Amino acid sequence: MAQASERSAARVQVYLDCPSYLCDFDYLRTEITFVDYVRERTAADVHVLVTTQNTGSGGTAYTITLVGQRRFAGALDTLLYNASQVNSQDVTRQAFARILKLGLVRFAVHTNDADKISVSFAEPANAASPTVPTRDPWNSWVYSANANGNTNREKSQQFSSLRGSLNADRVTEAWKLNISANENYNESKFRLDDTTQFTSVRRSFGLNGLVVKSLTQHWSAGLHAGASSSTFLNQRRAYRINPAVEWDLFPYKESTRRQLRLEYGVGVRAFQYNDTTIFNKLSETLPFHALSVSYSQKQTWGSVGGGANASSYLNDPGKRNASVFFNTDLRLFKGFSLNFFTHYSNIADQIFLKKSASTTGDVLLQQQQQATSYSFGFFGGLRYSFGSLLNNVVNPRFGGSGGDNFFFSF
């Protein structure tokens, strides 16, 4: 580590690179006070990069990477913390702050504040006892259920929705299993006058399963299966099953920082329709194959992600679907960042479209999928922040913590 043999009068300057929904910045600033926090990454001595992954038990695995810059250039450390699903937000932030504090001590000992820092160790009461493997009566299975609803009503219109889901997961180093079911109900009503009213109802149901076998640090094999129904897609019943294989250019253990995954699968889809389709079908069974590639990377300069998906029916390759997407959040220079997301799909596989013409109400209320050959979307934003680089003070009065910035989106 640069200047490791000398102490500096300057405090360690730290840049926290962590989404606000993962890190409680005010809490960290009040709990870890032996460093200075800066708003600009290039002004920092230590860039703290936080990434996460979901664990098999429903918790969150944090990877905390401390990257030395300026006087600590070349220093690199990685810390891990697993937050249990049952943790409260306070328990998680306390543990996260404790681990981050330990990581920052490595740098702070090279400042004049070193004499004020102490590290303690709480010796377990039964330290002499041999370690016993933890017994898991659930055998790594995690179950969850979710139900929610909302309504919004006015004199001439009202909206209501109900959603429910069930999930069962089992994740080990060798296997990954997931079973999920969900149902959605959406209703919209519009009253034009005392005698005219439009009502739109959309229902959908899905049952999905996934089994994945770990082969190596770069290869996996899996099986997708599912059943669904959707009034929007004219599908009374839809079934699919397809085995697949996946390859990652980078070892899976690096997935919180970077991934380049390629997946290919071949399978069968079966459909039963509510109404006769544009191809005069009420039911059909078709073989298909699908290929997808996805890339993501998060570094101190920002994050990028993108991918492409393509699928077609083997009996009629002309019935196909291809899509690409790209997103980025880049810190271009001091105080200035750019973020955008875009996607495009070429669509030629809408075999489910009903033959009869849609009414004006169906179109306006989006009650049924309409024919299209493409789908495109874009969002972009710029952010510029300037002023004092130091960001140590927490002042919760009247809400918020102050600071001026300029934001523009298009």
Language-model region placement:
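Transmembrane beta-strands of outer-membrane beta-barrel pores
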Residues: G149-R153, T172-A174, E183-K189, A225-T231, ...
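Outer-membrane beta-barrel translocator domains and adjoining extracellular loop/strand segments
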Residues: S156-S161, F190-T196, N234-I241, Q272-N280, ...
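Transmembrane beta-strand segments of Gram-negative outer membrane beta-barrel proteins
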Residues: A10-V14, P133-R153, A174-I179, L260-V268
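Residues on the lipid-exposed face of transmembrane beta-strands in outer-membrane beta-barrel proteins
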Residues: A145-A147, G164-R170, G209-K213, A227, ...
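Residues that define the transmembrane beta-barrel architecture of outer-membrane proteins
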Residues: N139-W141, Q158-L162, V201-F205, R237-I241, ...
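Transmembrane beta-strands of outer-membrane beta-barrel proteins
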Residues: Y143-A145, L177-I179, A221-A225, I241, ...
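Short loop/turn motifs that connect adjacent beta-strands in outer-membrane beta-barrel proteins
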Residues: P133-S140, E173-K176, S214-H218, L233, ...
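Outer-membrane beta-barrel "beta-signal"
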Residues: F341, A371-F410
